[in-house]
A protein has these predicted regions:
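Alpha-helical transmembrane segments of multi-pass membrane proteins
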Residues: 2-248
Length: 248
C-alpha cells in the first residue's frame, strides 16, 4: 500500500498511476463542486458557466455579478498558475513530491475550509466571496496538477471534455469502414479502453457530487475534512521521502 501511494503521486510517472490518481481526483472535484453549490449556490469548477453568467450579468448591467464572475475566473487561473510554479520548482529541485506538493496544499486549504466555514458564515459580506475564491483557487490548483502530470491527457474538475471524447470514440466505433481501397491499418476504430476510462471519470464526478451534497446536508462544512484527509493520504508519501532524504 505504501509503495502504491508513493507511486501514485510521486515523481516517476506511468499511465497506470495517472489514471488511478485521476479517479480519486475526479471524485474529489465532484464532491467539492457540489459542496460549494450547497454552501452558496455556485459551482466553482465550471468556468464555462461562470464566464457565461458574467457575460449575461454585464449585458443587463449587473456590475457586481459580472465582477464576481471575473474574480472567480482569476482565482481559478491563479490556482493553476500557483500549481505550475510549485511543480516546476519541485522539478528543478528534483523532488519526489513535485506533483504531491500541490495536492498537499489543496488538502490543507480544504481542511481550513472545513474547520472555518461555519465561523465564516457570520461575516455575510466576506463569507460568499471568500468561499468562492477559495474553492475556485483549489479547483485550478488540482486541474493544473493533473494536466501537467498526465501531459494534458487528463483533466478532472469538469466533464464537458470527457463527454465530448466519449462521443468521439463512440462515433469512431460506429463508423463503417466499407471502402476496400483502404487497408485495415487505415480503418477508423474507437478506443474502447478510453471510453471505459472516461465513463468511469464521469460516474465518479457524479458520485462525488452526490456524496458532497449529502455530506454537506448531513454535517455542513465539516464534511470537507473527508476530502482533505483523502488528498493528504494521496500526497504525503512522496513528501515524506523528500523530508527523509534532506535530513540524511
Amino acid at each position: 500500500m505504501l509503495s502504491y501511494l508513493t507511486r501514485l503521486t510521486g515523481r516517476d510517472r506511468e499511465e497506470f498511476y495517472d489514471d488511478h490518481l485521476a479517479h480519486f481526483l475526479t471524485f474529489n472535484a465532484g464532491a467539492a463542486n457540489a459542496g460549494g453549490f450547497m454552501a452558496f449556490q455556485r459551482y466553482t469548477s465550471h468556468m464555462t458557466g461562470i464566464a457565461s453568467a458574467s457575460a449575461d450579468a454585464l449585458a443587463i448591467g449587473e456590475w457586481q455579478l459580472f465582477l464576481a464572475g471575473l474574480i472567480a475566473i482569476i482565482a481559478f487561473v491563479s490556482g493553476a498558475a500557483f500549481s505550475a510554479i510549485l511543480i516546476n520548482w519541485g522539478r528543478r529541485k528534483n523532488l519526489h513530491s513535485q506533483f504531491a506538493v500541490p495536492l498537499l496544499l489543496e488538502s490543507l486549504l480544504l481542511a481550513v475550509f472545513g474547520f472555518l466555514g461555519d465561523w465564516m458564515q457570520q461575516f455575510h459580506a466576506f463569507y460568499f466571496p471568500a468561499t468562492a475564491l477559495l474553492l475556485c483557487f483549489i479547483m485550478g490548483l488540482q486541474n493544473a496538477m493533473i494536466t501537467k502530470m498526465s501531459g494534458a491527457r487528463i483533466r478532472t474538475t469538469h466533464i464537458t471534455g470527457m463527454v465530448t471524447d466519449i462521443g468521439i470514440e463512440i462515433g469512431k466505433s460506429l463508423y463503417w469502414n466499407r471502402d476496400p481501397a483502404y487497408s485495415t491499418e487505415h480503418h477508423v476504430r474507437g478506443d474502447r479502453k478510453k471510453i471505459r476510462l472516461l465513463m468511469n471519470f464521469v460516474a465518479l464526478f457524479f458520485l462525488g457530487g452526490l456524496a458532497g451534497g449529502i455530506g454537506y446536508n448531513w454535517s455542513g462544512f465539516i464534511a470537507t475534512l473527508f476530502l482533505a484527509t483523502l488528498l493528504f493520504l494521496l500526497a504525503i508519501m512522496p513528501v515524506l521521502q523528500d523530508i527523509i532524504r534532506s535530513n540524511r
